[in-house]
Design a protein with these regions (language model features):
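Internal, glycine-rich beta/alpha segment that forms the wall or movable "lid"
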Residues: 49, 60-61, 85, 89, ...
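N-terminal beta1-alpha1-beta2 module of alpha/beta enzyme domains
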Residues: 3-81
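A short, compositionally biased domain-edge/stem linker segment
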Residues: 1-2, 173
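Structural motif corresponding to the early beta-alpha repeats
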Residues: 72-80, 86-95
Length: 174
């Protein structure tokens, strides 16, 4: 990924962390040593064996999609192995996540990495994966919006609650 901050172009790498790929801590350390600005990792909670959703890249689903690590756990390892490298989700599948747990994971990773976390989000492409999480794919954008609003409240307020169509929780500390 490339992005511009002010007048400076920054360069990052995208990685599918799996149990048979390069160790994420070693990769992060190597990227930082070579002057990269960031490391982004994907998210899939699971890939249903029987799918209605075709792979967006066409053809067969690559093996790496079948065995991805949790992005927050993987990025925690990368954070521990580096000092300056920014760490990001590319993307975090918000419709499939509990907003309270996700808000806690995001805040914890950002704090423990000294503010190096980049939270990139999306709705996803795999209809079957969404449905397994109880999400109607046609409403995923509405679900994303509401969950993000709930998480923003948890990050901004000492005692935050939320009441909506998809998210409901009483004022809580998080």
């Amino acid at each position: 990924p490339l992005w511009i901050t002010g007048t400076v172009m920054q360069v990052g790498a995208f990685h599918f962390p799996t149990d048979y790929g390069i160790d994420i801590a070693e990769l992060a350390h190597a990227l930082e040593a070579r002057g990269f600005d960031a490391l982004f990792v994907c998210e899939h909670t699971h890939i249903p064996v029987s799918r209605k959703s075709p792979f967006p890249g066409g053809g067969e689903l690559p093996k790496k999609y079948k065995h991805t690590h949790d992005p927050f756990v993987a990025l925690s390892f990368a954070a521990a192995a580096t000092r300056k490298l920014k760490l990001g989700t590319g993307i975090c599948l918000i419709p499939q996540r509990d907003p309270i747990v996700t808000a806690k994971s995001v805040a914890s990773l950002d704090q423990l990495s000294n503010g190096r976390f980049i939270f990139a989000i999306g709705g996803g492409w795999n209809v079957d994966e969404m449905e397994h999480h109880g999400v109607d794919p046609s409403r995923r954008r509405d679900v994303v919006r509401e969950k993000v609003l709930a998480m923003r409240g948890l990050w901004a307020e000492d005692e935050a609650g939320y009441s909506g169509d998809f998210v409901e929780f009483a004022p809580s500390w998080s």
